[in-house]
């Protein structure tokens, strides 16, 4: 049994807390376990005391207060009620001032990361340019600039795809600058007809695809250069994955341009230039990831994959085991067949992968009874292996998607200002002076894309 307090002590006093019409009763000793919080500090709590009803009144979210009061009763255990949205509960926790440690544990339990601060440049002109290119939601001009950037990205991707069509592709392997590297002294025209020695050769710089590509690269380079010059921190800028993607998007053009100029001057080997340009052309396809800067859906997909790396790793590991196991089994089951496609275990890897992923091209198929049994088991094992981690990945996607939508809805609403019930004399022990309204702490949670901004 707990020792009883002497009569003069007020720690056993029963307090009535009225939260939006719902009355709670507890002891002052319970709230006093955390004296740095709003309810644990008598001076701060007294601002909300109603003398007429002899109770403390808080016009706040009622379902959240059960967990807040349990935090005091349990000695520091904070659990969000299942029917309370995360952003609403975090606002209530911030209002009652339960502390950074409790919020950190809650974020860890909920899997809610702290939004990183996005610094702003000190100079006004640099700050305007940074907001214009980095924050599309900051102004109407920034939205227009984002639309232009998306259109340029789409044009670049369309050109990348169109130049591989037979009607536009030369007989040589490659297009644009890569095509010229293999063309020799007499490149073929766009219509595919043969180029006679008497006709002037078509240089790659006159190619319409090259012109459009050059215009797109000029825009990408200008955009990247402006953001690099006005960014508040060069270290943070180069650590950003999106900025690295922007750099990779323009790098192939300049490498291909330098290779082509060197080829025309007779510097370097033509075969080596063609090999380099083929790799460079493949890198150009990564330009499509620039759209993720302007697409919330791609950002949510990236967050889902990042949060599901463990499950994806297990999936790849299970597939690896299954591929080795079933490719070995089908090889020994079909080894006696003269016309067998399974000539070795490595040759059977392709069949095992296609079968376990339930694609089934049919280019390789077992013929013997034993091989068919192995194929059936391989297909069943593939279905089970792939289906196991899928619910976890879907759950992660649903979590990030709802967090994004709830964050957008939260920005449309604001709380009614809490007005204390009466004045409090002095400001001792953390109290407030007469007429002062307690301020809410700064926002401790923000949806993806809504970051705190500070000047550096």
Curated annotation (Swiss-Prot):
Highly expressed in skeletal muscle, heart and kidney. InterPro entries: BTB/POZ_dom, Ion_trans_dom, K_chnl_volt-dep_Kv, K_chnl_volt-dep_Kv1, KCNA7_BTB_POZ, SKP1/BTB/POZ_sf, T1-type_BTB, VG_K_chnl. Keywords: Glycoprotein, Ion channel, Ion transport, Lipoprotein, Membrane, Palmitate, Potassium, Potassium channel, Potassium transport, Transmembrane, Transmembrane helix, Transport, Voltage-gated channel. A motif (Selectivity filter) lies at residues 358-363. The N-terminus may be important in determining the rate of inactivation of the channel while the tail may play a role in modulation of channel activity and/or targeting of the channel to specific subcellular compartments. The segment S4 is probably the voltage-sensor and is characterized by a series of positively charged amino acids at every third position. Belongs to the potassium channel family. A (Shaker) (TC 1.A.1.2) subfamily. Kv1.7/KCNA7 sub-subfamily. Heterotetramer of potassium channel proteins. GO terms for cellular component: membrane; plasma membrane; voltage-gated potassium channel complex. One of its GO terms (biological process) is action potential. It catalyses: K(+)(in) = K(+)(out). It is a multi-pass membrane protein. Mediates the voltage-dependent potassium ion permeability of excitable membranes. Assuming opened or closed conformations in response to the voltage difference across the membrane, the protein forms a potassium-selective channel through which potassium ions may pass in accordance with their electrochemical gradient. A lipid is attached at residue 231 (S-palmitoyl cysteine). SMART domains: BTB. CDD domains: BTB_POZ_KCNA7. The chain crosses the membrane at residues 144-164, 209-229, 241-261, 276-295, 312-332, 373-393. This is Potassium voltage-gated channel subfamily A member 7. GO terms for molecular function: delayed rectifier potassium channel activity. Glycans are attached at residue 191. Its main location: membrane. It is found in: Membrane.
